[in-house]
Amino acid sequence: MELDEVIITRAIFEEYSKTFLEYTDIDVALVGGGPANLVAAKYLAEAGAKVAIYEQKLSLGGGMWAGGMMFPRIVVQEEACRVLDDFGIRYKEYEPGYFVANSVESVGKLIAGATSAGAEVFNLVSFEDIMIRENDRVTGIVINWGPVTTQRLHVDPLMIRTKLVIDGTGHDAVVCNTILRKIPNAKIGEFGILGEKPMWSEVGERLAVDATQEIYPGLIVAGMAANAATRAPRMGPVFGGMLLSGEKAAKLALDRLKKI
């Protein structure tokens, strides 16, 4: 058949616009497209929640793509292998309790798992602010195009209403820090956002799961953002804690949605 460039343009514009409008009112907005939020998105979508991931960059996956220092391999502990199994990610045992997976395959299958389950992805869309209502509860997010943010252009944003937000923005804990900056006397965590501690893989991995919580009304924190929000150590290219944090975040969100 003969291709018509205008039909191609219309197809892309109309279909994306329909999806964008459909997702202006959702159950859970996952800010950041790293491994923790990809895991959470899959489990939430499978449970029937209407969820969307908002990622400022072109690609999802956070820091998982490059493995350790651009060696495309990651390490996962035995207790997190069930999450790898859920996504069909292959791995092998290196030493007892240490399992190695290909980082590129891992990211690809995490993305495929989340989207196949029904999670919608808005890449090149940046988080700019939160929406609040009574008692300063988080009720939505304010978004803009990623290049608008990176180029510091003066362009007003648009808004998304959501029952819950999951901050999966990694080391910067962007959503948490926005709340601290904009809501006087807001209490997040025991000491506020002090940033993560230096490397300690064992403790950082354990606390990544322990720190995954509804840290502020309407806001759940997951992955490396959970460590940054609770003054826990970083852990490097071992990703079991990230995967289990995403699993826990989904469970917390589903329980919370039942009460809203």
Swiss-Prot record:
Domain of life according to the entry: Archaea
GO biological process: thiamine biosynthetic process; thiamine diphosphate biosynthetic process; thiazole biosynthetic process
Pathways involved: Cofactor biosynthesis; thiamine diphosphate biosynthesis
Residues bound to glycine: 234
Pfam family, one: Thi4
Binding site for Fe cation: 156, 171
HAMAP family linked to this entry: Thi4
Family statement drawn from the similarity comment of this UniProt entry: Belongs to the THI4 family.
Name of protein: Thiamine thiazole synthase
